[in-house]
UniProtKB/Swiss-Prot annotation:
Residues 182-198 have a biased composition (Acidic residues). Keywords: Cell projection, Cytoplasm, Developmental protein, DNA-binding, Nucleus, Synapse, Transcription, Transcription regulation. It is found in: Synapse; Cytoplasm; Nucleus; Cell projection, Axon. This is CCAAT/enhancer-binding protein homolog 1. One of its GO terms (cellular component) is RNA polymerase II transcription regulator complex. InterPro entries: bZIP_sf (IPR046347), C/EBP (IPR031106). The keyword DNA-binding applies. Residues 171-181, 225-248, 255-274, 281-291, 302-319 have a biased composition (Basic and acidic residues). May interact with transcription factor ets-4. May interact (via N-terminus) with nipi-3. May interact (via N-terminus) with importin subunit alpha ima-3. It comes from Caenorhabditis elegans.
Amino acid sequence: MYSKLNYSHQKGDQALKHPHLVRLQQSEVRGFTDMPNNGASTSSAGSFARQDSLTIAASLQQRDRERHPVDFMETELDLGDYLQVLHDLDVPTDNVDFDDAELQKCNILYDGEHPYEQPELNGYERHVAYGTGYRVPGDYDQDGYKMNCEVKAETPDFGATKTRRAVKRPVPYDDYQKEYSEESSDMTDNDGSVDDSYFEPKSKKTKSAGLENFKPQTRARKYKLKADEEKAEPTYKLKRARNNDAVRKSRKKAKELQDKKEAEHDKMKRRIAELEGLLQSERDARRRDQDTLEQLLRNKGPMKEQRMPQRHILENFNK
C-alpha cells in the first residue's frame, strides 16, 4: 500500500519505500510517480499539495484497462489500492484550501451553505465530524433553507350526506316502461322518508298487469278430452281402473318406505338415549369409587413400623 505523502515545501517528495510499490515501479505498470506532483491537484494558495483521489482512481482504472483490454469488466479488481489512497490523504482539518477546484464546485452546488438542518453536537463531536468550519445552527436562520413544498389540504364540500335512499324490486321486462313512467318518476334519491332497508311492495295493479302480460316459456302437454261415447266403452273404464290401481300402489309403497325410515329413526334415537344413560351411570360409578378411595386414604392413619433394637434381637437369639 502507498505511504503518506509529504505536504511540506521544505522537504522534497520522498520516494515510496513500500516493497509492493517498488515492484510496481520496476514493472511496466508504474505507480503514480509518472504523474505531476504524484497525481495531486495543486491550488493557487499553495499551502499544500492535496492528492486528488478521483484522479488516482481514474488512473488505476486506466491501468487495469491496459492490462486487460478484452475482459476488463469480467476481471476482479483489487479495491485495496483505492481504499488505501483515500486513507493516506490525511488532510488536516484546520488547514483547508478554500480555493481548491473541488471545493469551489461544492460551493457552487450548495450555494455556500448546507441545505439541511444540522444536528445538535457538542464541541468534540463537531470537531471530529465536521472540523473547525462547522457552523452552529443558532448562528443563521434555518427556516430559510427549508423547501417550500407544502400543499394546502383541500377538502371537497360534499354537502349533506345522504343516509336514506329508495330501493325498488326488479319488475318484469314487459311492463318495465309503463311502471317506470307511472311510479318511478315519483321516487327520488333525495326522499328522506324512506329507510335504506325498506323495499316498497308492489301494488295490486302491478300484479294484475304482470299476470295479464305473462307469457309462458314452456309448452304444455297435449291433452284432449275424451268424448262421452269413448268414456262409455268398457275398455276405457278398464284402462282407467288399472291406472288408478297403479297410482294407489305406488303411493302406498312410498308411504310404507317413509314409515319404515321414521321407525328406524325412532329406534336409533332410543338406542342413543340408552347408551348415554349407560355411559352416565358408568361415570357416576367411577366417581363414587374415587371418592371412596380418597375417604379411606384420609381416614387411614400413618403406619408405625415397630422395630426392635438390635441388642434385643441378639439377646433373644442367644437364649
